Each structure stands twice: as C-alpha cells, then as structure tokens.
Amino acid sequence: MSLTTAAPLLALLKEKDAEVKAYALQSINEGVDQFWSEVSNDLPEIEALYDDNGFQDRKMAALIASKVYYNLGEYESAVKYALAAEEKFDIDEKTQYVETIVSKSIEMYIKLATEIYNKSGEQVNLDPKLTIVFEKMMTKCTQANEYKLALGIALEAFRLDVVKSILQERLGEDQEGGSMKLMSYVLTAATTTVFNSKFKDEILRLLFDLLMPLKNADYFITSKVVVNLNDPELATQLFEKLHDEEQIEVSYQIAFDLVSSASQHLLEKLHHNLSERSYDSGLLEILTGIPTCDYYNTFLLNKKNIDISLLNKSKSSLDGKFSLFHTAVSVSNGYMHAGTTDNSFIKANLSWLGKAQNWAKFSATASLGVIHKGNLIDGKKVMAPYLPGSRSSSRFIKGGSLYGLGLIYAGFGRDIVDYLKTHLIENSGTTGDEDVDVLLHGASLGVGLAAMGTANNEVYEALKDVLYNDVATSGEAAAFGIGLTLLGTGDETAINDLFTYAQETSHGNITRGLSMALALINYGRQEQADELIDKMLASENSLIRYGGAFSIALAYVGTGNNKVVKKLLHLAVSDSNDDVRRAAVTALGFVLLRDYTTVPRIVQLLAESHNAHDRCGAAFALGIACAGKGLQAAIDVLEPMTKDPADFVRQAAMISLSLVMIQQTEKMNPKVASINSHFLSVITNKHQEGLAKFGACVALGIMNAGGRNVTIQLENAETGTLDTKSVVGLAMFTQFWYWFPMAHFLSLSFTPTTIVGVRGSDLNIPKFDMNCYAREDVFSYPKMFEESADKEVEKVATAILSTTARAKARAKKTKKEKDTNEDDKKKKEKDLKKEETKKDDAKKESEAEEDFNKNRYSSKPYKIENMSRVLPQQLKYVQFIKEERFTPVRKFKGTNGVVVLKDNKPSEPASIIETVRQSKDVNAPLPTPFKVTEELDFEKI
C-alpha cells in the first residue's frame, strides 16, 4: 500500500535503534520526490544523522538532504550533500535530479578551476569529491563517443591533461579519421572560446606536439597552430618536416597562407632560418611576400573597373583650393585605385594637384603609396621623384613620399626599413626646424608601417630619439611608429617608458599618439593588458583615457568578452570627456568583430543618444564590426544617421555605411544605387557642411575601392585568425578624426576579391576555368555613374511694370478662388492613385527580391576564369572542375587568395597570365615546353 504522508517515516528517525533509522531513511529516499515538502521540516535531523560519524547509513542521509535541497532550489547545498553521499549518489541514474546535480557540479568545478588557474584566489580549495564527479563524467562522455563534449568541458575547466589523454587515445585508435577532426575542433575552440592567453598557448603547443610525429599529419591544421602561436621556431620545424617528406607543393601552399595571415616578425625570422639551411629558393621567395603582392597587383590592374566619372564629379564639385576638400578627393582617389598601380587620374589632373597647399600636398603625395600598395619591386622607383634628395622642393611632398613608401611596403618592409630609418637618424638632431619636422613626420609613419610587428630594436631607438625631442608634429608620428613597430609584443620596458612620457609631455598630440601606441603594443594580449588598461582609464588626463578605450579594443579584439563589453558600455555613458565616450563606443566594434550580428542591437540605443559623440561612435562601431558583411540590421541603424543634425555624425554614418556595403552588388542589396546617389548628392549640395562632404567623398572611395575589386576582410577564413593588418588599418583609420592623412591607413584593410590559382612547379598563373553554381548576373558590378544630359536650362525672368503686375495678380486671385475646390478634388484623386501605384511597385519589388534571394543557386554552372573577381558571398558557389588539368593541392573549401595547383599534364604547354612583375622583367623568360618532330615534310610547311 502506497503512503500518502511521510510523517510515520519521519517519526521513526527519532528512534534510538540505528537499524530502524536506516530503514526509515531507505523508505524516505524512495518517496522523497513526493514528500519533500514534509521532509524539509525535518532537515536538521537528517543533516545531524549525516554529521554523526558513528551512524553507518549517514551517506543515505546525505542523499536525502541533497534531494530535498534540490527540490527547494538550493543547488549549491544539493551538490554539497550529493558529493557527501559518495557511492549512494548514482551518476548513471537517468533522472532530472541527477542530471541537474551533475550539471551544477561541473559548473562549480569549472568556476573553482578557473579561479585557481587565474590565481585570483590562492585560498580556493577544490573538493576532491567534485573532481571525482568531473572525471567520472569525462569517462562517461568518452565511453559514449561524445568526444567533442568531453573536450569542450575539459577546456573550460583548464584540464589540459584530460584533453591530452582523449586526443592520444583517439590517435592510438585511428591516425587519420576522427582524430584529425577532433584536433581541428580543439584548435577552433582554443582560438575562439578560450580567453586566457597562457592556457591558449599551452593548448596550441600540445596540438603541435601531437601533430608533428604523425606519419600522415594534416599539415594545414599544423600551420594554423603555428600562425596562432606566432612562433618562428615551430614554423621552421614544420617546413623542415615538409622538406624531408618532399612535399614541395604543400609547403608552397602553407607559405602563401603564412604570408596572408602571419606577422612580419614570423615571416622574417622563418625566412632567415630557412636561408641558413639553403632551402628551396621558390619557398624563400614566397615568404618575402613579393609573389603574393605581384599576383594581387596584376589582378587589380587587369580587372580594374574604376568609376572615373564618379571621381571626376567629386573633384569638380569640391573646390580644390580648400585643404579639406582637396584631401577628401586625394583619399578617395587613393582608395579607388588602391593596389592597381594606375595613377592616370593624378597625371590627368596635374592642375588640380597644383592647388594643394601644405598638408594637402602631404596627403596627395602619400596617396600614391595607396595606389601602388604592394608594388614591392618598383615601389621606391615610383616614389623616387618625390623623395628627399629629388628635385622636389616642398617639405610636404618629401614627407608625404616617405609616408607613401611605408604604405607601399606595409607588412613587407624588409627592403625599405633601413632607407627610412636613415632619414630618422640623419634628421632627428635638427628637430624644431619646420622642414625637418614634416619630413620626420612622414618618415616615422613610413618606418612604422614598414617595420610593423617586427620589434626591430634599431627602429625603436631611432623613433624614440625623435619622440624625446618633444616636438608636436614629429613626436606624434614617432609615437604611432613605435606602436606599429612593437605591435602585439607587450614589451614591458617600452610600455613603462611610453606611459611615463605620455604623462610628462605638454603636447596633447604626443600624449594621444603615445596612448594609441600603448594600445597597439597590447594588440591581442587580452588579460595580460588589464593592469595597463586600468592605469590608463584611471588617469585624470582624458587623452590617456582615450588610449585606454582603444587598448581594450585592440587587446580584446574579436574575443566578444562580456566583462569587457560591460566596461566599454559603462565608459561610454559615464566619462566626462566626449572623445573618450566616442572611443569607448567605437571600441565595441573591435571587441565584437566575430559576433558582428549582435552589434546593431547593442549600439541601437547609443545611436539614438542625446550625445552626438556617442552617436558617432555607434556609427563607427557598426562600420568596423560589420565591414564587408552587408548586414541589413547595420544598414537599418546607419541610414537614418546619414541625416543626423550633427555634421560629424553624418560623416561617420556615411563612412561606416560604405564599410558595410563595400563589394555589395545591386542584386545582392538593392540599396547600393540609392546609397551611392545619396553620397553624391551630399558632395554636390552647396548647403552641406564641409565635414559631411568630406565623409561622403571618402565613403564613395571606399564603396568603389581597388577598382571595385577589394573588400574588407577582418578574419582570415583559412587559418581562422584575425587579419592583424586589416584590424590595425581600421584602428589607425579612426584617427583621421584628428589628422586627415591617417585616412590612408584604411588601405591596409583592403583584401582583393579573387582566387589566384598558381602552378606549384614554377609559381606561374595558368589560364583555366572554374565552375560557379550561381546565377550569372548576381555578382556583376553596380552600374557606372552617368550624369543626366537633359538638364533644364534656367530661364531668365523678363521685366514687368508694377501696374501690369498688380492687375495680373488681381485677375489671378479671382480665378484661383474659383478653381480651388476643383483642383483640390483632382489633387486628392491623383495622390491616392500615386500611393496605390507606389504600394504595388514596392510589393512587387519585395516579392521579386525575396524570390531572387531564394533562387541565387543555379544547377547549371557558368565558367569563371582563373584570377577573376570572386566576391566573398560568391565563394560558396565556386568549384574547381575535377577533370580540369589544374587541381588544388589542398581541398578547396570556398576561400579566396592564392591557391597552389597541381599540374596533371606537366609535359604539355600551358597558357600563362603575365604578371606586372613579369611584364617589367628585362631578363629573357624561360622557354615554354615544346615538342620536337623528327621527320618534317618541308613541302607541306
């Protein structure tokens, strides 16, 4: 007979006989889920039974106490008593109670393990019983083949030993199948969800140690590990193994991947290590970055689709006599021609160029560096007419040319660093002379770009000498140069020196430059930068707090760390300085790069703030996080902001809108045409403020950047890492707020939208086709700008006598009163008809658009040539043809960039695409293979 109350059983607990108590506990346990509310009244007695060490069934008492606390919702106490129950608590029991207790146990274990690992609480004690539950669950997961679940929990709990044992166990079972997938899973988890830098490094080194001894290792996963660790010695080991196994084409592909994703420090050190071992000259050349840049320059030049009429319209609408407008057109021209090596617009508009004054000349000259970005062979030759020592007399042209040189060689400056460094050393002793300061300004920015991330000590010392001269013009640029050179190094000595000097100097420009330098030095360092960030944010100097916001942005870039997001939001609404508030909101864009879809929701309220600087920051945050994504939610927030009352908010909104919309076609987003025309209307409108016009002109340049063949890609799809150069380019670009020439830094973020198939045997680009399974017109270029020819001729009013005018007015008034009623009726009818027509058209458009988006895929492919424009959204539709002569060395997974190809018919001649470098090569090219026929019939020739 079933019990309806627990009272009799609870009464038995008061008996003295231990066996009676044990029976009562056993019976209560069976019905505790039903009678827990009654049992809860006697909890103190049950707990007392557990506390009695002489009572044999005390573990059962603990189990009952746990179940009662579970039903009361007090999970911490429930876990405590469940652990005390030891073997009485059956971890395999399939009940909600057990699942909840196990889940809460693991949560508690992870929390305590995190505290211990971070040493945030040295007195923290980890209950061994909690560890037993955790390890039992790990065993249970592996027995059920739930390896990913076990690895994920182990990573969260900082249990590297568990991760290692699971991976080794799987490697022992099968060397190729599931184990490689698990390795890839751990790599992805480590790079996207593990926020502790030290533990992340430990995981990656473990993966490298496990992968390297394997006979059939996946070297592409290994290369991703190397890039994330940024360790040249590990990279050298990888290439040595590839060399020993004679996997030349695979090593070439990995080298190209490293060029597009690794730091300059890693590339230079790796090149040096392999040079000492007399490695394959082809591999060494790839590591210099010259072939990659040459391929991209060739693509951008051959496929350029520059809307020159748009640029001409901007130029004619903005008066070049004003420095602001001249700089806007220079920057826009630089963007539109970025990487194409085509400076025809400048040559065709020399009279306009001559209008430039002072710093506008500096910007115009530097824009040549943007146009020739990546031209590593002829870069210095192109800039030679403007460099110091040439016939040019203007100090602004000389300074601008040195900055331009840095923009050409950004990230690949091995051959130009010494030249730029010489200018710093020769002139640093004569600062204070305005001519010298302008030259040093350009040289400091140039050398910072060329030596980016190398931690070159000689460059650092030369820049420090310029900085300590305490001249605002050269000192600010020297600070930026130091930040770029020491990018991501976290050099403690440099950090202390720069922070101290930022507090001491009386020049605001230098303080702000040093604050940004500190942010750059702490790039990607996460919690290791916390101490400095707290010091900067606690400073009374708003310029240092400004740098603190950017330090958060760059130290935690792409992490999506909640703690950091909260800190930035608090700073955005509480700081007394507008610049700091704007920087804090902008920083959200960097932190949430990988979670970009959440940004419109987070900044929505800030975009409607009463504070114009918060609104401006919200616009920049959207532009940065959603760059190149075409995210509709971001566009919906930004579009109303282009009509904001504050001119600088409109400027930020237009620039950010162009960052989001870059490489969007009219079929992908119908708003492309209207946004472009809005930018143009702002430029041509005489009543718009100068800042808004500047923003519109720059935005047009971004929308049509690189001959309409580049995008902004902040994450490297192949390695899963952030593109450091792109992130730094955007961060430095935001400084145009204070100094317009900084706008050129955005060119660092431009990524060509192409697939370049390269033959592994000779690094030439063969002509062949790929399949694209999409509708052919989806990804076509937007229409070129055409100025309407049917402009109305303005009529000149004829003179009328005053008496005649009065008579006409009286007659008109009488007639008007008669016709008013009839006109009103007709007008209302017309308006109604118009509205109905508009609604019908809008409905048809939305239906057509919806239908189009659903049916973007086509079962019948069309052919695209090698080195064609392939948009990021198009990549998933592209496939290599299996029967084709050229096939990729690595399985193609829809990523752009350089793809090394295997030639399946190497003895047959192939058509080759000539690169920019090859077209200028004075040496005779190697002859193409040909067949010799022994017997020739000369009569038939």
Curated annotation (Swiss-Prot):
UniProt PC repeat ranges: 363-396, 400-437, 442-476, 477-511, 513-546, 547-582, 583-615, 617-651, 652-689, 695-731
Pfam families reported for this sequence: HEAT_2, PC_rep, RPN2_C, RPN2_N
Compositionally biased region (Basic and acidic residues): 816-854
Superkingdom classification of source: Eukaryota
Keyword Transcription assigned: no
Alphabetical UniProt keywords: Proteasome, Repeat
Record-level GO cellular component terms: nucleus; proteasome regulatory particle, base subcomplex; proteasome storage granule
Region (Disordered): 808-854
One of the GO BP terms on file: proteasome-mediated ubiquitin-dependent protein catabolic process
InterPro entries: 26S_Psome_Rpn2, ARM-like, ARM-type_fold, Proteasome/cyclosome_rpt, PSMD1_RPN2_N, RPN2_C
GO molecular function: endopeptidase activity; enzyme regulator activity; ubiquitin protein ligase binding
Gene3D superfamilies in UniProt: Leucine-rich Repeat Variant
Function field: Acts as a regulatory subunit of the 26S proteasome which is involved in the ATP-dependent degradation of ubiquitinated proteins.
PANTHER family linked: 26S PROTEASOME NON-ATPASE REGULATORY SUBUNIT (PTHR10943), 26S PROTEASOME NON-ATPASE REGULATORY SUBUNIT 1 (PTHR10943:SF2)
Sequence similarity: Belongs to the proteasome subunit S1 family.
Record protein name field: 26S proteasome regulatory subunit RPN2
Gene: RPN2
